[in-house]
Curated annotation (Swiss-Prot):
Domain of life (superkingdom): Eukaryota
Chain residue ranges for the region called Disordered: 19-39
Positions in coiled-coil regions: 3-54
Molecular-function GO terms, alphabetical: ATP hydrolysis activity; proton-transporting ATPase activity, rotational mechanism
Protein family: Belongs to the V-ATPase G subunit family.
Subunit structure: V-ATPase is a heteromultimeric enzyme made up of two complexes: the ATP-hydrolytic V1 complex and the proton translocation V0 complex. The V1 complex consists of three catalytic AB heterodimers that form a heterohexamer, three peripheral stalks each consisting of EG heterodimers, one central rotor including subunits D and F, and the regulatory subunits C and H. The proton translocation complex V0 consists of the proton transport subunit a, a ring of proteolipid subunits c9c'', rotary subunit d, subunits e and f, and two accessory subunits.
Protein name according to UniProt: V-type proton ATPase subunit G 3
Gene Ontology biological process terms in this record: synaptic vesicle lumen acidification
PANTHER family referenced in this protein's UniProt entry, alphabetically: V-TYPE PROTON ATPASE SUBUNIT G 3, VACUOLAR ATP SYNTHASE SUBUNIT G
Entry keywords, A to Z: Coiled coil, Hydrogen ion transport, Ion transport, Transport
Organism of derivation: Xenopus laevis
GO CC entries: synaptic vesicle membrane; vacuolar proton-transporting V-type ATPase, V1 domain
A Pfam entry, by short name: V-ATPase_G
Protein role: Subunit of the V1 complex of vacuolar(H+)-ATPase (V-ATPase), a multisubunit enzyme composed of a peripheral complex (V1) that hydrolyzes ATP and a membrane integral complex (V0) that translocates protons. V-ATPase is responsible for acidifying and maintaining the pH of intracellular compartments and in some cell types, is targeted to the plasma membrane, where it is responsible for acidifying the extracellular environment.
Length: 118
């Protein structure tokens, strides 16, 4: 009986050691997962910072050239407004005279395709 009791004790101790090893393995696994997550987060943050810096650099280069474009567009707009204004003043009288002539000098005549029937 003592040998059975001793065998049972050995089995219980072996079971306890196995359970302890499993718990230890779970702890190591959780620790590795946390560490991997922290490393991944650090890598992601570093990548994000790099991409944001690249974006800002590109944005400033584009916005800087857009500022120059805005000035050029403004100059071209002023030039076109002046051109159209001078053209308006130059041709205003002639166009108005033509329109009034067309309105006042009416020559009634039949259309060429009209066929008169009696």
């Amino acid at each position: 009986m003592a040998s059975q009791s001793q065998g049972i004790q050995q089995l219980l101790q072996a079971e306890k050691r196995a359970k302890d090893k499993l718990e230890e393995a779970k702890k190591r696994k959780n620790k590795r997962l946390r560490q991997a997550k922290e490393e991944a987060t650090a890598d992601i943050d570093q990548y994000r910072l790099k991409r944001e810096a690249d974006f800002r650099r590109i944005q400033t280069s584009v916005m800087g050239s857009q500022g120059n474009l805005a000035v050029k567009i403004e100059e071209q707009t002023v030039e076109k407004i002046q051109f159209y204004s001078s053209s308006y003043n130059k041709y205003k009288e002639g166009v108005l005279k033509e329109l009034l002539d067309l309105a006042y000098n009416i020559k009634p005549e039949l259309h060429t395709n009209y066929k008169y029937k009696i």
